[in-house]
Amino acid sequence: MLVTITCFGLNQACIKNHVVILNLLAPGRILEYHCYSNVDDLGVKRLDFNATPFTIKFHDEIPNLTKWNCILRQGPNNSMEYSYDVEVYKAGPRLIPRCGQLRAWAARIDGIYFARKYNTPLKRVLFWNK
């Protein structure tokens, strides 16, 4: 007796999603950020002006909806008087995870900017809360 088993599946691994945080405020102006998800808390960190961007790399959690928030803070003389709690990534309801998604967020003096694709200009989407 000969038994043959055939398995079908995805041949390609799911590329991790990326949330990128940039400090484009001004020379000497520090961006403080606290990023957290429904399963991880990365703690409070600081990013100098034009420093290497901070990147969160992750896979979507199925069946849970992956969600990342970052509280961004900045101010003159590092007073951190301006802030915004930004939902930087949210997976929609789905059975198949998203792969290779980009969410780029940049802090500038006049607001918070966003891009969803590489090589596209950042657009202002939020204004700072005081």
Swiss-Prot record:
GO terms for cellular component: extracellular region. It comes from the Eukaryota. One of its GO terms (biological process) is rejection of self pollen. Keywords: Glycoprotein, Secreted, Self-incompatibility, Signal. It holds the Pfam family Self-incomp_S1. It is found in: Secreted. Coiled coil: none annotated. Glycans are attached at residues 64, 77. Belongs to the plant self-incompatibility (S1) protein family. This is S-protein homolog 30. The gene is SPH30.
